[in-house]
Amino acid sequence: MKTSIRYALLAAALTAATPALADITVYNGQHKEAAQAVADAFTRATGIKVKLNSAKGDQLAGQIKEEGSRSPADVFYSEQIPALATLSAANLLEPLPASTINETRGKGVPVAAKKDWVALSGRSRVVVYDTRKLSEKDLEKSVLNYATPKWKNRIGYVPTSGAFLEQIVAIVKLKGEAAALKWLKGLKEYGKPYAKNSVALQAVENGEIDAALINNYYWHAFAREKGVQNVHTRLNFVRHRDPGALVTYSGAVLKSSQNKDEAKKFVAFLAGKEGQRALTAVRAEYPLNPHVVSTFNLEPIAKLEAPQVSATTVSEKEHATRLLEQAGMK
């Protein structure tokens, strides 16, 4: 009896000595479905609960700056590198362990200068086209060539998309400011703007326009839902280092976090094999961890022949926004 009591007391002491894991709050600028899938997988693996506060990345970055040290957020998960760059420049992000950053480090994958955010998954800028009107041979070799009279009222674009803004940055870096502004003015004059990538995709599917500049995963989700054999559209990857660039989603831990250990575990989980599998099982994003393969049968990133561009900075984002204004798109 005394032995049983002794063991019970020992177990109680060990339990008391083990600190409870804190729940974490994630300010989420990623698509909610994908973020929720990863959060649920993380909770199952660790027991740490995750509260998602979802909104646009820029909006959340502004909120974090305003909240400062009082922010309840532990992690910022953004689809836009410029939003992360804004917080990094304000010294609001906590450096991440090299082991986390190295999980997704590879050729062409942007790396934070201060090592305070990590690239997690990729999306490719693509041209979705109507197969009833066009074949691959009818498509342009460069995304810049869609902003021409040949494509008047035939090409769609989404000027409010964060990925579109980063594509402008890529064009400036690779081709120069004049080329970027010419491209924007051409799209403004000859193209048709849409409020969302999904709306632009549907416009091509419905035959309203011949093609549109979108992100790859919108089409993959649509094709999976409808059945590839039942849709009229396909994707064209521009390739050969054209500014149809790979864009990354990223995650970061905030310096103001009261639960840094748990927050860093979450970001490490996102970059690791289990988190990457959970994310890419529900969205057609490119896993950046080399040990994970997408369930959407995506081409390997290397075959996309994406251009090598550095991570977008705050000043580059602001410059791209000014070009949008000059072109009359804002």
From Swiss-Prot:
Alphabetical keyword list: Ion transport, Iron, Iron transport, Metal-binding, Periplasm, Signal, Transport
GO cellular component: outer membrane-bounded periplasmic space
Annotated PROSITE patterns: SBP_BACTERIAL_1
Keyword Signal: yes
Residues noted as binding Fe cation in the record, renumbered to the chain: 31, 79, 217-218
Induction: By iron deprivation.
Gene Ontology molecular-function annotations: metal ion binding
InterPro entries tied to this protein: Ferric-bd (IPR026045), SBP (IPR006059), SBP_1_CS (IPR006061)
Primary localization class, coarse: periplasm
Single GO BP term: transmembrane transport
Cell compartments where the protein resides: Periplasm
Signal peptide positions on this chain: 1-22
Pfam families, A to Z: SBP_bac_1
Claim: GTP-binding is one of the keywords in the record: no
Family label: Belongs to the bacterial solute-binding protein 1 family.
Functional description taken from the UniProt entry: This protein may be a central component in the iron-acquisition system.
Further remark: Iron co-purifies with FBP and is bound by the protein as a Fe(3+) ion at an approximate molar ratio of 1:1.
UniProt name for this protein: Major ferric iron-binding protein
Biological classification of the source: Bacteria, Pseudomonadati, Pseudomonadota, Betaproteobacteria, Neisseriales
